[in-house]
């Protein structure tokens, strides 16, 4: 099933926009409203599974926290394992970490060292692509463990914030269901 314009419009309409959140001048795209609609949530998962079902994916990685909500069901649909990437000190086994830049500071992500095997073909899934910093750090973690990452999938792409271009420079093809301007 290839996504139809009608299906994509349905998904777009299920995402509420909140003006001036989290601060003045921001139009926030609330993907949790899509989760509240079981038809929209199921459709978003079905479309991502359909796109990647013949891509030879061996693991799906989702970033904390909303990436878990989409990545885990996509992994189930593909019949592969799901690997969470989390903030520091949230994973119980041995981890490696990657630091990345935020607008005014830095943050860090971690992954279990045994979660990705050399040669794993990994799909990264998250709810939203903005600047691409979080996904870039996630890709670095996967590659440090020997995994191959060529694709990342998102529900929302804030297309004018440069995330897709940033990830393309890392050899990542980005796919999103719903584009929005990032203002």
From Swiss-Prot:
Keyword field contains Zinc-finger: no
Give the pathway listed in the UniProt entry for this protein. Answer: Purine metabolism; AMP biosynthesis via salvage pathway; AMP from adenine: step 1/1
PROSITE patterns with a match to the protein in the record: PUR_PYR_PR_TRANSFER
- The main location is cytoplasm
The protein's annotated catalytic reaction(s) are: AMP + diphosphate = 5-phospho-alpha-D-ribose 1-diphosphate + adenine
What one GO molecular function would you report for this record?
A: adenine phosphoribosyltransferase activity
Q: Which UniProt keywords apply?
A: Cytoplasm, Glycosyltransferase, Purine salvage, Transferase
| Location relative to the cell | Cytoplasm
**N-terminal signal peptide:** none
Q: Which domain of life is it from?
A: Bacteria
GO terms (BP aspect): adenine salvage; AMP salvage; purine ribonucleoside salvage
Q: Which EC number applies?
A: 2.4.2.7
Matches recorded under InterPro entries: Ade_phspho_trans, Adenine_PRTase, PRibTrfase_dom, PRTase-like
Q: List, alphabetically, the GO terms of the cellular component aspect.
A: cytosol
| Cross-referenced SUPFAM superfamilies | PRTase-like
What role does it play? Catalyzes a salvage reaction resulting in the formation of AMP, that is energically less costly than de novo synthesis.
Under the subunit heading, UniProt states: Homodimer.
Q: Which protein family is it in?
A: Belongs to the purine/pyrimidine phosphoribosyltransferase family.
Its protein name is Adenine phosphoribosyltransferase
Specify the species: Salmonella gallinarum (strain 287/91 / NCTC 13346)
Q: What is the lineage of its organism?
A: Bacteria, Pseudomonadati, Pseudomonadota, Gammaproteobacteria, Enterobacterales
Which gene does this sequence derive from? apt
């Amino acid at each position: 099933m290839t996504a139809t314009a009608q299906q994509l419009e349905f998904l777009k309409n299920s995402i509420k926009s909140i003006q001036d959140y989290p601060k003045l001048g921001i139009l926030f795209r609330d993907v949790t409203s899509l989760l509240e609609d079981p038809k929209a949530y199921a459709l978003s998962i079905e479309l991502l599974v359909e796109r990647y079902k013949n891509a030879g994916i061996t693991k799906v990685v989702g970033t904390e926290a909303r990436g878990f909500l989409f990545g885990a069901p996509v992994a189930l649909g593909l019949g592969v394992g799901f690997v969470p990437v989390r903030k520091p000190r949230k994973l119980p086994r041995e981890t490696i970490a990657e630091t990345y830049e935020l607008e005014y500071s830095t943050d860090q992500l971690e992954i279990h060292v045994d979660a990705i095997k050399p040669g794993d073909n990994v799909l990264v899934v998250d709810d939203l692509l903005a600047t691409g910093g979080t996904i870039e750090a996630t890709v670095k973690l996967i590659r440090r463990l020997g995994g191959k990452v060529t694709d990342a999938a998102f529900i929302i792409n804030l297309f004018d914030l440069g995330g897709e271009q940033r990830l393309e420079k890392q050899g990542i093809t980005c796919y999103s269901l719903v584009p929005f301007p990032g203002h």
